[in-house]
């Protein structure tokens, strides 16, 4: 709260233009780490798959980012994530979504360490807890908008995520005044920065 109250001396992010991100080129060694991985790392049973928790959260709420981050395998009906905490040889990968290598693992795919949306979620939590004054609902909604708009710029697959699509999604995940609603959407927005989402889970217990 002290940093927020002294923004003249401790400025905070004010737009996606302030995001702390790594930009890469298509020539080694200046490439995204995942760009050096074969496509099989994203599509096989021994590769990396999204967990059912985040896939279910996004699917049930109509989150437009789901098609930016994940891909449905051929023949799949709907979105399905993998079960967490089991060995790959014990898992059934039938119909499980793949990570979208074109957006996450291209040689030139950017990697964001901290984004504007995270700052807004932090502000929303601080307001909800009574640490600072402000409009928690506005911070929450603007955080979601900032996250989606960031990923729209990253997307190379041509998904048509209009402002109307974003506003319809916001109507599906309204802020209800609780910390849980803030952290649940922050958890989704922190996809691909998993250590931050894990830190929030350890201190808040959300998402359940």
Explain the meaning of each model-derived region.
Residues 148, 152, 159-208:
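C-terminal functional modules
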Residues 3-4:
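Short, small-residue-biased leader/transition segments that mark boundaries at the very start
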Residues 15-132, 138, 142-149, 153, ...:
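Elongated scaffold/linker segments in the mid-to-C-terminal portions of large proteins
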Residues 7:
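Residue-level signature of catalytic and energy-coupling elements of molecular machines
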């Amino acid at each position: 709260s002290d940093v927020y109250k002294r923004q003249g001396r401790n400025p905070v992010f004010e737009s996606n233009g302030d995001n702390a991100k790594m930009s890469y080129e298509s020539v080694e060694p200046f490439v995204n780490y995942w760009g050096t991985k074969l496509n099989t790392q994203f599509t096989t049973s021994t590769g990396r798959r999204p967990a059912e928790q985040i896939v279910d959260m996004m699917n049930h709420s109509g989150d437009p980012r789901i098609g930016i981050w994940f891909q449905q395998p051929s023949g799949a009906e709907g979105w399905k994530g993998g079960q967490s905490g089991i060995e790959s040889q014990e898992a059934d990968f039938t119909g499980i979504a793949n990570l979208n290598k074109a957006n996450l693992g291209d040689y030139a795919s950017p990697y964001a360490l901290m984004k504007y949306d995270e700052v807004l979620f932090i502000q929303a939590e601080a307001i909800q807890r009574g640490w600072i004054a402000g409009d928690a609902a506005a911070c929450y909604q603007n955080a979601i908008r900032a996250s989606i708009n960031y990923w729209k710029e990253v997307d190379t697959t041509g998904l048509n995520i209009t402002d109307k699509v974003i506003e319809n999604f916001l109507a599906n995940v309204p802020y209800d005044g609780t910390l849980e609603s803030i952290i649940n959407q922050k958890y989704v927005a922190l996809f691909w920065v998993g250590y931050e989402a894990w830190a929030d889970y350890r201190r808040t217990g959300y998402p359940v």
